[in-house]
Design a protein with these regions (language model features):
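Zn-dependent metallo-beta-lactamase
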Residues: 2-51, 241
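A short, acidic, amphipathic alpha-helical segment used as a generic capping/interface helix at domain edges
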Residues: 179-185, 204-213
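Structural motif
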Residues: 53-54, 73, 154-157, 196, ...
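Core dinuclear metal-dependent hydrolase active-site scaffold
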Residues: 27-67, 115-191, 253-260
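Active-site metal-binding motif and surrounding structural segment of the metallo-beta-lactamase
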Residues: 58-104, 185-196
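Short amphipathic alpha-helical segments
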Residues: 65-66, 84-87, 112, 168-169, ...
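Binuclear metal-ion centers of metallo-dependent hydrolases, dominated by the metallo-beta-lactamase
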Residues: 33-40, 109-125, 141, 207-260
Length: 260
């Protein structure tokens, strides 16, 4: 198991109310993968030869080594998970890149002159750099990603979550829960070096339903809560209410030097 070490973090109170925390926390998984939280559900993972960017929405990227290729993953078309500006940013940085996009993005965006693999759920894709990508069906939109690299295996949920909403019909909530659990059962017992899972405060008392089911069924060295809409208090709430999982949960918006 890799050691996960907080490297750099800044106080989220320094951010404007219109910004998500940008590049403010770095994590190392040993000497193999460096993980940078960009914003919302967006993360940058650096390996020896490649960068992986997941669900870029907004925010600046750190300096990137032009000798490394970038692979851009977008789980679905929602604007808080897919922003085509990421390609302009990478062009301006002089980076070589390719993209792995959920098929629902192709229907709504015309992206020409890009190296793109459009993906469907429950499929396996082998990229030309040796990365293997498996997909799950999101119970909201698009897919979730399982990305297997030489350095480790990554899970990014996109919008696959136990979306229980107060005030919605009971049957709808039950359907979403059943669909979520069916997908997670497909990866039951699988090992991930890093997992990125929604923890959405808008769900009220059901905010942790999805991440709890994931933790109890899937083995991951470390789990990064995401999709919390700039309300980092939900991470501390989870750690407080479920201290038994504290060692596996990374607070992407913790202050410098805070031990979790």
């Amino acid at each position: 198991m890799y050691d996960i070490v907080d490297l750099v973090a800044s106080d989220p109170r320094c951010l404007s109310e219109n910004d998500y925390c940008t590049n403010q926390t770095l994590f190392y998984t040993g000497d193999m993968m460096k993980i940078t939280y960009i914003n919302h559900s967006g993360f940058l993972i650096e390996t020896k030869d490649c960068y992986y960017i997941f669900d870029y929405y907004r925010g600046e990227l750190p300096h990137l080594d032009k000798e490394k290729e970038v692979i851009v993953f977008c789980s679905h078309f929602h604007e808080d998970h897919f922003n085509p500006q990421i390609f302009e940013i990478l062009d301006d940085m002089g980076m070589t890149y390719q993209a792995v996009l959920a098929n629902d993005i192709r229907k709504r965006n015309h992206l020409s002159d890009r190296k793109i693999t459009y993906v469907y759920h429950d499929q396996t894709y082998n990229l030309d750099n040796g990365t293997e990508v498996d997909t799950l069906l999101s119970n909201d939109s698009g897919v979730a990603f399982i990305v297997k690299t030489k350095e480790g295996t990554i899970y990014h949920a996109g919008d696959l979550n136990d979306w229980y909403w107060d005030g919605e019909p009971k049957a709808d909530n039950q359907r979403l829960t059943s669909a979520y659990r069916a997908e997670i059962r497909k990866i039951k017992g699988m090992h991930f070096d890093a997992a990125f899972v929604p923890l959405d405060p808008r769900q009220g008392d059901h905010y942790a339903d999805g991440i709890l089911y994931f933790i109890k069924n899937v083995d991951s060295n470390v789990i990064f809560p995401m999709h919390y809409w700039n309300d980092a208090s939900v991470i501390k709430r989870f750690i407080t209410e479920y201290p038994q999982y504290k060692s596996r949960i990374k607070n992407t918006e913790c202050t410098k030097g805070e031990e979790l």
